[in-house]
Amino acid sequence: MSREGWIGIFLITILMFLWTLWLAHSARPQTPQKENPVPTDSIEKTTPATEDRPEQALDIGPYARFIGLPESVLVVQTPLYRAFFRTTGAALMSLELTRYQDASGKPVTLWDERQKSELTFAEGRYLIPLHKLSFEVTYLPKTPIEKAPDSAVFRLTLAKDTFIQVVYRFQPEDYHIEREIIFQNFNDRLRNPYLVHHVIIETPQTERSASLMQPYTALYYRQGEDVDYLQPDEDEKIEKTFQGNIYWISAKGHFFTQLFRNDAGYSAVTLRSLPFSKGELPKYEITLQLPMEEGRLRESLYLGPLRYTYLKKYGRDYEKQLNLGWSFIRYINTGFIIPVFQVLEKYIPSYGIIIAILALLVKILLSPLTWQSYLAGARMQVINELPEVKALDEKYKDDPNKLMMEKSLLYRELGVNPLSGCIPLLLQMPLFFAMVSFFPSAFELRQESFLWAKDLSTYDDLIRWGFHIPILGEHISLFALMTALTTLAYTLLSPQSTSTTTPGMKWLPYLTPVIFFLFLNSYSAALSWYYTVLNILTITQTLIMRRMVDKEAIIQKLRQRRQKRSNAGVMRQSVPRWLRQAGKRR
């Protein structure tokens, strides 16, 4: 290929590299009518009131007697999670997912003592901290909840018919926990028709490295019909305030999220991302104003995986938290790649094989473009071997501008475009970007092993050492190395590489695999495996096409074209003016 062609390929590679770096940093339910007695086996432990608790000094009027009472911890279990609730504040204490493990093999914990949830409301002159008041358990479901929805009910009784009731509703196969707070017979006692929910969230480390998780963390929110996000910053506090029209807020991790939702819309929201150190995960402060209607308010909490199929079924734009690329790229992922995965995973247990089949399907779809690109490269190889071209190289070896102009004239006489081989590559770039976006965000690949890789969602590190090497890191990914080697093999095999006559451009075929290796070395092993398979298929395809291409027929066809376009005056006028002027200046 000509120098211009190799420059085009090199720039495409650099663009892919820079883009991926940037990407790494972008009906009311019924309340239970019957209150069953609480089964004692659901009460895990009881803790006495702490002595000299400062809450006892709070000026909260008639609610002071509900401070500092003994606390019970209750357990609710479904097929998806195990949740612990405390009677103090009728609050969620911790939640662990039973189907997923963290890097140490323990259940993924998405809520624990590091997370804080504080509810306050105003009554008369008092500001009441609901999260510090002691409730009684009036109904607790028999667990595990496996067949039908069920509820847990907590109550704080002020008078015979005046009470605060907190109801949690659970579904057997749903990661949502719905909470309803009822102020019964409060009439005009509440100063404001809302509660304030203040939340402090520390992003839980669910994967093996916090530094690898950090680029995928953000605070997402849905405002009206749009989903946007607040990107945390290591060095400064970031704050956003909204008035109404916010329907959910999500502290997104890499593969799991903690999401709060109010279908009526939060009447006011403040989001804060706090500074954090390198190698740590972000910490957020969220203040939500929950509107109350007829003494009732509702809020849902989603603590679960960021799997596209789960998020999409809720119909609330949860899936827009997943970084699947820009609008057009996203359509490729949601319209082609994800559906293919959904179909294949029903029949094939190995995701490594699924990825290989996906590469085969992509190669079949791109075969027409690959054929056109190969033909263009073969034509340029034949042209560069013509005596006329070699004579031009020798005649103008000291005058590159003149050589460029004369070659451009010759190419036009032959009816070829030296950059035509790059056009099919450009058309394939959206698919490349889609794959780069999809694989690191694909929950399906999390902790899925293949060959020597223990987790396809991150890099494989079979070869590693105990110190950091700049750019390379502390390991070598064998999948990334395979991608680099197969890329080099394909590049050297293609006709473009053999047609590079400019001495300064001959290093480009070797630089491209190096760039790919350095990037993929700390990237998803699934992406490296995908491109390894794709390269092997491309090499096989190239060997087949090489047998199909007749160089003598190409030469004959080129000479026929030249004969038809033999008017040199016209051809010389067709040379770009800037190129002719450059030749004259020399």
Where do the protein language model's features map onto the residues?
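Helix-loop-helix
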Residues: 1-39, 85, 181, 200-213, ...
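Short secondary-structure boundary micro-motifs
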Residues: 57-60, 66-69, 93, 151-153, ...
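Juxtamembrane extramembrane loops of integral membrane proteins
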Residues: 12, 25-104, 110, 114, ...
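Aromatic/His-enriched, Gly/Pro-containing loop or helix-boundary segments
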Residues: 1, 41, 143-146
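Hydrophobic alpha-helical segments with strong N-terminal bias
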Residues: 66, 73, 237, 241, ...
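Soluble non-transmembrane domains of integral membrane proteins
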Residues: 73-321
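Generic detector of short, locally flexible boundary/turn motifs and exposed helical patches
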Residues: 46-53, 58-61, 143-149, 160, ...
